[in-house]
């Protein structure tokens, strides 16, 4: 005969197991995102970023909000830099997300500080004054929305990123 405690033990262990899996996935995302950002920064001789749990929580909140609203916009009145990435019907790795932003480097003219097309995601990644990054992803309904926050923010008009 099963005791009451035995009956309830499996759900507790399942919860602990799932929490451990989620934490491991979170650490992997943190590692891969930070490594990818710092690889791009190293290409231009900019000091590496450090990971911020505070910025990550903010990024997760905004990614979840965007997914729930089915909207893709920057957070209004933010005091942080922000990069967004959206993909539908597929999944992206942290390295693919960062490399998509980094590919904008071809649109950036360092001498004039002007972009030919979009380059703000790239310049935020390599902004020399930025010290911390925190990123998150929200998934659902065939969509992935990635958000990275940067502190201090970059992309000041007329200034070179490094």
Which ranges hold each PLM region?
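Short, well-ordered surface patches within globular domains
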Residues: 23-81
């Amino acid at each position: 005969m099963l005791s009451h405690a035995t009956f309830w033990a499996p759900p507790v262990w399942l919860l602990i197991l799932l929490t451990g899996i989620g934490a491991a996935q979170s650490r992997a995302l943190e590692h891969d995102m930070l490594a990818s950002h710092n690889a791009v920064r190293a290409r231009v001789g900019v000091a590496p970023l450090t990971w911020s749990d505070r910025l990550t929580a903010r990024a997760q909140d905004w990614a979840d909000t965007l997914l729930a609203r089915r909207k893709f916009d920057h957070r209004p009145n933010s005091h942080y830099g922000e990069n967004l990435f959206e993909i539908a019907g597929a999944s992206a790795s942290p390295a693919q997300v960062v490399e998509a932003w980094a590919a904008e480097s071809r649109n950036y003219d360092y001498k004039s500080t002007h972009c030919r097309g979009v380059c703000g995601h790239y310049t935020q990644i390599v902004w020399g004054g930025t010290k911390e990054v925190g990123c998150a992803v929200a998934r659902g309904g065939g969509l992935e929305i990635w958000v990275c926050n940067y502190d201090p923010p970059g992309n000041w008009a007329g200034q070179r990123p490094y």
